Amino acid sequence: MIDILLAGVGGQGTVLAAKVLAQAAQSKGWQVRTAETIGMAQRGGNVTSHVRMGSNGEAIYSPLITPGTADMVIALEPGEAARALPYLAPGGVLVTATTAIHPVTAALASQPYRAGDVVAALANSLQAEASREQAAESIVAPNTVTADQDASTDGVEGYPVPLFIPVDDEALVREAGAGSRKSLNMMLLAVAVAQGRVPLTVDELKDAVRACVKPQFVTMNLAAINAAVEACG
């Protein structure tokens, strides 16, 4: 069984990303359960989607992922990654965009909301978790997505090591071209798949996009996926 939590801000397409992920899993014959929690505002509020996939033929009875059990958290915004972090299981994978969406309250706060600080705090938190579990000597936390990231999450003495994959989404948007900011959700799914962290192929992800996305937006989303896969090498 694979449990993936997707987190973002209203309007980023978190629910659509969950739908695409579920479609790709269902096309393989897996049982899938999904659920969403949506903030007060349709746009600007936090949105969390739960996707539970029976990748080994398991029956799934509850659509909700409990804290500390998610195999992967995919966040479309670093602040939402921090909010969703308690759901990550030991040895889990955190994939997050590094560009912040500034809430209205940030303008009123004495301390500015800096995406870089949040990303650094996430890395430090996962490093501390690895240390607490007496796992690996250091966490794999590159500044950008690369093709040669260590695929192992086995620490010394068998303790699982969390993996942090911060994604330079601004660079991916430039690579994919105009309009691709709207496809950030598909970019992050593609990164997770291309890194081998989700047992799906890129082609299966693309087929799910064709099945779930409105026809006029398919080409844009496929281009975003291609840009993300190319960035991963």
Per-range role (PLM):
Residues 1-233:
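Active-site cofactor/cluster-binding pocket
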